[in-house]
C-alpha cells in the first residue's frame, strides 16, 4: 500500500501464468500512457510455487511488445540527463492532474492490449474479474493469489446453498 497513490499502474496476478502474461502486456500499457507500471505477484505463494505456464513464442512476444523507442532515455551515452524532484511547487498540481488523466486513459489501453493479447494467446483478464456474482448476496474484493482461495471458499459455500 506504500505506493497506492504514487501514480503507478499496478497489475495483480492470481497465478504464475497471469504474472507472466501481465509482464508481456505491461510494456505496451506503460508506454502507451507514459506511466510506470508494476506487475505485482505474491512474495511467497506464487513466487515459491512450482506451476506450469504456457510461454508465448519469442517471435510473437517481440511482435506483440514491439521495439522500445524511449522519447527520453535516462541512460543515453552522449546525452546525459539528471532527474530530480517530481515537480516544483508551481507545476506540481498540473503534473498530478496529467498523471490522473493518464491513469484514466489507461483503462481503455488495458482493454485494448488485453484484447490483442487474448487474440494471440487465448487468455484474457480484463480490468476486474468477477466470480459467481449474478445472484450473490455478499462479495469479497481481493487481489493476488488469495483470489484462488476465495474462489474455492465460494464454491464450498455455494455447495451448501449459500449465496
Predicted features and spans:
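A short secondary-structure junction signal
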Residues: 21-24, 49-52, 151-154
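Conformationally flexible catalytic loops at phosphate/diphosphate-handling active centers
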Residues: 37-129
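Conserved thiamine diphosphate
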Residues: 1-43, 67-68
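Glycine-/acidic-rich phosphate or pyrophosphate-binding loops and their flanking alpha/beta elements
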Residues: 116-139, 151, 155
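Structural beta-strand/beta-sheet cores of well-ordered domains, especially the beta-sheet scaffolds
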Residues: 35-37, 79, 136-141, 162
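Short helix-loop-beta junction
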Residues: 153-163
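Gly/Ser/Thr-rich loops at beta-strand to alpha-helix junctions
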Residues: 16-17, 44-46, 143-149
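Short glycine-rich or small-residue beta-strand-to-loop segments that form or flank ligand, phosphate
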Residues: 9-14, 137-143
Amino acid at each position: 500500500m506504500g505506493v497506492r497513490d504514487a501514480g503507478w499502474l499496478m497489475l495483480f496476478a492470481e497465478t504464475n501464468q497471469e504474472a507472466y502474461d501481465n509482464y508481456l502486456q505491461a510494456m505496451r500499457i506503460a508506454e502507451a500512457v507514459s506511466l510506470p507500471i508494476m506487475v505485482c505477484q505474491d512474495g511467497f505463494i506464487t513466487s515459491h510455487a512450482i506451476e506450469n505456464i504456457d510461454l508465448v513464442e519469442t517471435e510473437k512476444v517481440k511482435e506483440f511488445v514491439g521495439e522500445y523507442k524511449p522519447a527520453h532515455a535516462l541512460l543515453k551515452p552522449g546525452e546525459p540527463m539528471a532527474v530530480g524532484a517530481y515537480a516544483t511547487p508551481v507545476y506540481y498540481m498540473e503534473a498530478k492532474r496529467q498523471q490522473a488523466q493518464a491513469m484514466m486513459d489507461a483503462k481503455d489501453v488495458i482493454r485494448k492490449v488485453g484484447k490483442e493479447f487474448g487474440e494471440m494467446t487465448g487468455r484474457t483478464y480484463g480490468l476486474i474479474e468477477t466470480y459467481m456474482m449474478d445472484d450473490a448476496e455478499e462479495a469479497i474484493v481481493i487481489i493476488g493469489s488469495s483470489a484462488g482461495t476465495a474462489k474455492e471458499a465460494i464454491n464450498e459455500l455455494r455447495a451448501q446453498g449459500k449465496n
